[in-house]
């Protein structure tokens, strides 16, 4: 039977220690988030003991370093599957997981502002593109501050034709939408606050 390992509130050093400890034992990162102040970022992760394609991960890197890691991974045939970020837009730090073996189409962006559906490079435009072109969010995150929110996302081809929707709303409205959709046999797939 596969084992799961999870932790939260881990420092970058503790997260790296767990990475070195769990990876050789056959565990894979299946969830990863970074939060808090960039000078003392905290990590939460879920590790699943199971086989799968080759994978790699990065954490504690700035936007330029993330872009380099992303470009290198894509050149090597890895697709992004998890992204998380914390901190102000201009000095955020990122954590991400990349995996080989994703033969269907995907796209990813970070540093997006909210914007309108016709505003190239905005989060709303990316979500509309995904919906219109048959993609589904694989991983989404919000970072920045209330006056300058930024978004990062990874979208993969929706090969299973899974119905999906997305909301950027206050908690009371979200709860009403959640209750209605759960009543219709849907479940949350991605949530970020």
Residue ranges: model-predicted function:
Residues 1-193:
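Terminus-proximal functional modules
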């Amino acid at each position: 039977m596969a084992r799961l390992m999870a932790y939260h509130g881990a420092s970058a050093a503790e997260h790296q220690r767990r990475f070195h400890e769990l990876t050789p034992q056959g565990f894979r990162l299946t969830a990863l988030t970074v939060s808090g102040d960039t000078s003392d970022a905290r990590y939460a992760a879920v590790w699943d003991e199971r086989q799968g394609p080759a994978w790699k991960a990065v954490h504690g890197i700035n936007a330029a370093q993330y872009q380099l890691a992303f470009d290198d991974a894509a050149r090597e045939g890895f697709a992004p599957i998890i992204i998380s970020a914390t901190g102000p837009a201009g000095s955020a730090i990122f954590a991400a997981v990349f995996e080989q073996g994703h033969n269907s189409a995907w796209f990813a962006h970070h540093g997006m502002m909210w914007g309108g559906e016709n505003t190239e490079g905005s989060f709303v435009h990316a979500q509309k593109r995904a919906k219109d072109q048959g993609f589904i969010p694989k991983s989404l995150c919000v970072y920045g501050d209330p006056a300058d929110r930024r978004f990062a996302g990874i979208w993969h081809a929706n090969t299973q034709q899974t119905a999906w929707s997305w909301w950027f709303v206050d908690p009371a409205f979200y709860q009403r939408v959640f209750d209605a959709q759960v009543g219709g046999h849907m479940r949350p797939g991605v949530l970020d606050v």
